A protein has these predicted regions:
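GHKL (Bergerat-fold) ATPase N-terminal catalytic module, capturing the glycine-rich phosphate-binding loop
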Residues: 1-124
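Short linear motifs in intrinsically disordered
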Residues: 7-8, 68-71, 143-154, 199-205
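Short, well-ordered alpha-helical segments in soluble proteins
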Residues: 34, 42, 149-150, 159, ...
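Surface loops and adjacent helix of pleckstrin homology
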Residues: 82, 130, 172-174
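Short glycine-/acidic-enriched loop or helix-start segments at secondary-structure transitions
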Residues: 89, 136, 172-173
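ATP-binding catalytic core of ATPases
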Residues: 101-169
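GHKL/Bergerat-fold ATPase module in large chromosome/replication-associated machines
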Residues: 159-207
Length: 207
């Protein structure tokens, strides 16, 4: 998405989750040909950028399957995106997808009405009918998982993730205070405050 900021809002009653970025957004063609297409191989099929985004970031993901993981925590997914002055959106539901598979027919998401589109820049996902048992221990656990998953979070990388207005940082990982010996790849610089206690540190050549 080439976003510099991702905002995550979690309903206190776990009725919905919103994820909104300020990236480049998607056109109707992008939504149909890339987002909705399972198995889209960006590295091979994006002739303009390939393995790098427009901002020069390494592309994440492999098989175009990550989008399906949303259905592990919610049965209804709304996708809204804005690009080049146009806004578009649709709704997908797990029961309708299963029914289409059973009937051996192609599934078509439900288009969102123009007055239902609230996105102004980038892409917005809204999850409904949350599977509460999959949320684990709530927001605290989500912060830890995201901090451990994305090493690019932080001002040094020009990328932030906020949950309910509070930025995620390396301290949310929860594991660095236990580290005595640290090896990092060249180009990655942990926040100084998180590694002040490290006994020995070494930088390895970039992969």
């Amino acid at each position: 998405a080439d976003a510099s900021s991702v905002q995550i809002r979690v309903d206190p009653n776990n009725e919905w989750i919103e994820i909104e970025d300020d990236g480049i957004g998607m056109s109707v063609e992008d939504l149909n040909g890339k987002y909705l297409r399972v198995g889209y191989r960006r590295r091979d099929e994006d002739a303009e950028h390939g393995c790098k985004t427009a901002r020069g970031r390494p592309v994440m993901g492999r098989k175009g399957l990550g989008k399906l993981s949303l259905f592990s925590i919610a049965d209804v997914i709304e996708v809204q995106s804005a690009k080049n002055g146009g806004k578009h959106g649709f709704r997908m539901t797990a029961p309708d997808i299963k029914k289409a598979v059973q009937d051996k027919r192609r599934y078509h998401p439900e288009s969102l009405a123009d007055d239902a589109l609230t996105v102004t820049q980038g892409t917005k996902l809204v999850l409904h009918e949350i599977k509460r048992q999959r949320l684990g221990k709530g927001v605290a656990a989500l912060r830890k998982r995201l901090a451990r998953r994305f090493s690019v979070i932080g001002q040094a990388n020009g990328f932030e993730i906020k949950i309910d207005g509070r930025p995620i940082s390396a301290t949310d990982r929860g594991d660095l205070p236990k580290v005595q010996f640290l090896w990092t790849f060249e180009g990655y610089e942990p926040e100084a405050s998180t590694i002040a206690h490290v006994v020995e540190r070494e930088s390895l050549p970039a992969r």
